[in-house]
Amino acid sequence: MRNAHAPVDVAMIGFGAIGAAVYRAVEHDAALRVAHVIVPEHQCDAVRGALGERVDVVSSVDALACRPQFALECAGHGALVDHVVPLLKAGTDCAVASIGALSDLALLDALSNAADAGGATLTLLSGAIGGIDALAAARQGGLDEVRYIGRKPPLGWLGTPAEAICDLRAMAAEQTIFEGSARDAAQLYPRNANVAATIALAGVGLDATRVCLIADPAVTRNVHRIVARGAFGEMSIEMSGKPLPDNPKTSALTAFSAIRALRNRASHCVI
């Protein structure tokens, strides 16, 4: 049994906008100790300069001074293969934010197999969307339909296939830029895949979850809506998310979800 007074030894994978926000939130939490940060080699010096000697900043799992009790990934899809898989194999429980990558079934299998091999637990964070607990509970009784509708301001879709569908810089009315499965949405819009993939994995799966993505000049924030029905009844939840102050492209709720995961790990009473 864990000593109630010993802080949980944590490794953070990634130190971008989300990682930095999470670190600031828990830096002085007596129940947690972020003792390790894993970032790409070219970022190590900058992160060491920001965090000082109290944190072990390395570029690989092999370089860690010791095995952490818990790891939090907020680094992007590549980090799942490079860092989360070996940590799980070594027996470290991990929570991951890059859920969109799990539309690749081979990667999901690799993570699951690594967790089995190490006797570790892999937690998928809810990230920028709410209602995941209700959706996952409803699945136990059977779900007939799950739909996700995602709206962004037109310029939020720059750099995606939406640019070939409409003039994102001169839109006067909303336009649907994608309709299909969550798996196809994740493949075509990888930078916007985390919410759709999270909903799919909590509910009826990547192929049965229907996704509609909309460029909407009437909205100023990213708007997420889940519609589901099944043996439990019906649900409809809509969220209009604010970004992190330090990064307008990153959902604040994604960072809060990661903070919650860390604090839940250190708590003996979890909701």
Curated annotation (Swiss-Prot):
One of its GO terms (biological process) is NAD biosynthetic process. Keywords: NAD, NADP, Oxidoreductase, Pyridine nucleotide biosynthesis. Its EC number is 1.4.1.21. Signal peptide: none annotated. One of its GO terms (molecular function) is aspartate dehydrogenase activity. It catalyses: L-aspartate + NADP(+) + H2O = oxaloacetate + NH4(+) + NADPH + H(+); L-aspartate + NAD(+) + H2O = oxaloacetate + NH4(+) + NADH + H(+). Specifically catalyzes the NAD or NADP-dependent dehydrogenation of L-aspartate to iminoaspartate. NCBIfam families: PRK13303.1-1, PRK13303.1-2, PRK13303.1-3. This is L-aspartate dehydrogenase. It comes from Burkholderia pseudomallei (strain 1710b).
